[in-house]
Curated annotation (Swiss-Prot):
PROSITE patterns: HSP70_1 (PS00297), HSP70_2 (PS00329), HSP70_3 (PS01036). Keywords: ATP-binding, Chaperone, Nucleotide-binding, Phosphoprotein, Stress response. The gene is dnaK. This is Chaperone protein DnaK. It comes from the Bacteria. Belongs to the heat shock protein 70 family. It comes from Prochlorococcus marinus (strain MIT 9515).
């Protein structure tokens, strides 16, 4: 099999790594950076931009620039009411699914499609680095992602043209990277605060075995929320001074968001940050500017509730693992948001330990994913990974109660069967409602979907025996089967709500992505051809000027004619003519170069140096040599 890359598909930034020579290597993108912004944009020319280039133009194109798509992946419209208010692009409803509105293309994208474009760029950049086409990947997800979000991430990989060999939890990946060379047993707590999600996992690591003891988290907490605190503060101050709410202007909101992120990063190292946004808006009285000084203490006060929310999952994970803080050997910090001093102080206060900062919080998850990819490809031996399911799984039973079949923190893969029966006499079918969560009532948990089993022989209530089996694979993705013991018939059931996209939708998106990829490739090739043509025209003019009368008039006229024709073809964007003329002009230039060297006095130096072919017949000036030498006489 080919190389398997590990991809950390982040809310804010993403990263790709691969195993090389038995060691994980982070791969820089085409722009030379080791992380890539998880941003996709479409310009007025309908060109697609991904990564840094998309992020740079966001202020001027807020409605067609998509970021933080991970917050919407695998979720329903009614689950993202708050998040949808905090982005500059439009969120629309398609049934119960989330769609991202792209006005410039007059179409809608699913969040999975946007994530797929980021995955495609990462895999293509990795392919260029490795010199081969990348088709297989291990992709990370927050440990607290539910079944729908995991399946949606897998769909995004498929749309990007990747076979997703494994979905792996981000804290587990970080532990793999941290503990790869550890021989002695350690109990570690991974504190993973990223751009949009927060996870805590407790693991036992040592001698190639990575066992997850517990996991907890909050999929609604991350760096974006800390940015939003600053955005709301800036907007409130400006509104009180000027009477204008900047959050209602998409372009102003985008500028506020970028300024907030910049200030947050600065305040991790400095005690204050100057926020200056000239011409942020305008009134009949003229332009308005925002100029404000934000101190670290002020920021920590604004974000105090968010910081406090980080405490509960830590305590829950320790409780579920049945460990005290004194039994934890190391605290591993993961995610860019862990650079905030207030977060580090909270961890120290809760655990009584200084966090271990030997790993790169932006890259460690991708490194761990690459190691898991190496395991699956057979490159890495003697690694055993035992992960857990983050949330309980069960079914709705009489009275609207959730009956748990697989409890949270159960090691995966796992399989569990329970037998259920009918509720009324003569019932010939049952509807089973599959749930995920920790609440007692079915309505308070995440619905993964319902399925119906027909053909049950008519019998008094309580007599039929329907065996329902829950099967969680190594990706943490659930499948359900049902068997009627009376008739002996067994049926495999697909949970219809497990993903927000149907198989047909995914297949269509795969085809669209492949089609767009070929269009994008053609555009790049045309741009490269145009650049080559313009460069050659410039070099031709320069070369003719430098050579002057060394070029005979007929050859010069021929070159000038070709150069002029190429210039015209370039301005008309006639790519077929450009390609033909480019080759012809290069041949004419080669001919000129050869003729110049063949002229007397312009012989090129011989391979051995300036005197390699010197004869013994010396002319009057042949004794003059610009070189140091020693003459030895016998």
């Amino acid at each position: 099999m080919g190389k398997v890359v590990g991809i950390d598909l982040g809310t804010t930034n993403s990263c790709v790594a691969v195993m090389e020579g038995g060691k994980p290597t982070v791969i820089a993108n085409a722009e030379g950076f080791r992380t890539t912004p998880s941003v996709v944009a479409y310009t007025k020319n309908q060109d697609q931009l991904v990564g840094q280039i998309a992020k740079r133009q966001a202020v001027m194109n807020p409605e067609n620039t998509f970021y933080s798509a991970k917050r919407f992946v695998g979720r329903r419209v009614d689950e993202v009411n708050e998040e949808s208010k905090d982005v500059s692009y439009g969120i629309e409803k398609a049934g119960s699914n989330v769609k991202l509105k792209c006005p410039v293309l007059d179409k809608q994208f699913s969040p999975e499609e946007v994530s797929a474009q980021v995955l495609r760029k990462l895999s293509e950049d990795a392919g260029k680095y490795l010199g081969e086409n990348i088709t297989q990947a291990v992709i990370t997800v927050p440990a607290y992602f539910n079944d729908s979000q995991r399946q949606a991430t897998k769909d995004a990989g498929k749309i990007a043209g990747l076979e997703v060999l494994r979905i792996i939890n981000e804290p587990t990946a970080a532990a793999l990277a941290y503990g790869l060379d550890k021989k002695s047993n350690e109990r570690i707590l991974v504190f993973d605060l990223g751009g949009g999600t927060f996870d805590v996992s407790v693991l036992e690591v040592g001698d190639g075995v990575f066992e997850v003891l517990s996991t907890s988290g909050d999929t609604h907490l991350g760096g974006d929320d800390f940015d939003r605190c600053i955005v709301n503060h800036l907007a409130s101050v400006f509104k009180s001074n000027e009477g204008i709410d900047l959050r209602e202007d998409k372009q102003a909101l985008q500028r506020l968001t970028e300024a907030a992120e910049k200030a947050k990063i600065e305040l991790s190292n400095a005690t204050q940050s100057e926020i200056n946004l000239p011409f942020i808006t305008a009134t009949p009285d003229g332009p308005k500017h925002l100029d404000l000084n934000l101190t670290r203490a002020n920021f920590e006060e604004l974000a105090s509730k968010l910081i406090d929310r980080c405490r509960v999952p830590v305590e829950q994970a320790l409780k579920d693992a049945k460990l005290s803080t004194g039994e934890i050997d190391e605290i591993v910090m993961v995610g860019g948001s862990t650079r905030m001093p207030a977060v580090q102080e909270l961890v120290k206060r809760v655990t009584g330990k200084d966090p271990n900062q030997t790993v790169n919080p932006d890259e460690v998850v991708a490194v761990g994913a690459a190691i898991q990819g190496g395991v699956l490809a057979g490159e890495v031996k003697d690694i055993l990974l035992l992960d857990v399911t983050p949330l309980s799984l069960g079914v709705e039973t009489l009275g609207g109660v959730m009956t748990k079949m697989i409890t949270r923190n159960t090691t995966v893969p796992t399989k569990k069967s329970e037998t259920y029966s009918t509720a009324v006499d003569g019932q010939t079918n049952v509807e089973i409602h599959v749930l995920q969560g920790e609440r007692e009532m079915a309505s308070d948990n995440k619905s993964l979907g319902t399925f119906r089993l027909d053909g049950i022989p008519s019998a008094p209530r309580g007599v039929p025996q329907i065996e329902v089996t829950f099967d969680i694979d190594a990706n943490g993705i659930l499948s359900v089967t049902a068997k009627d013991k009376g008739s002996g018939k067994e049926q495999s059931i697909s949970i219809t709500g497990a993903s927000t996209l149907s198989d047909n939708e995914v297949d269509k998106m795969v085809k669209d992505a492949e089609s767009n990829a070929s269009v994008d490739k053609e555009k790049r090739e045309k741009i490269d051809l145009k650049n080559q043509a313009e460069t050659l025209v410039y070099q031709t003019e320069k070369q003719l000027g430098e050579l002057g009368d060394k070029v005979d008039d007929s050859a010069k006229a021929k070159v000038e004619e070709k150069s002029k024709a190429l210039k015209e073809a370039t301005s008309k964007e006639d790519y077929d003519s450009m390609k033909k003329l480019l080759e012809e002009l290069q041949q004419e230039l080669y001919a000129i170069g050869s003729s110049v060297y063949q002229q007397p006095g312009n012989q090129p130096p011989a391979p051995g140096g300036p005197n390699a072919n010197a004869s013994d017949d010396k002319g009057p000036d042949d004794d003059v040599i610009d070189a140091d030498f020693t003459e030895t006489k016998d």
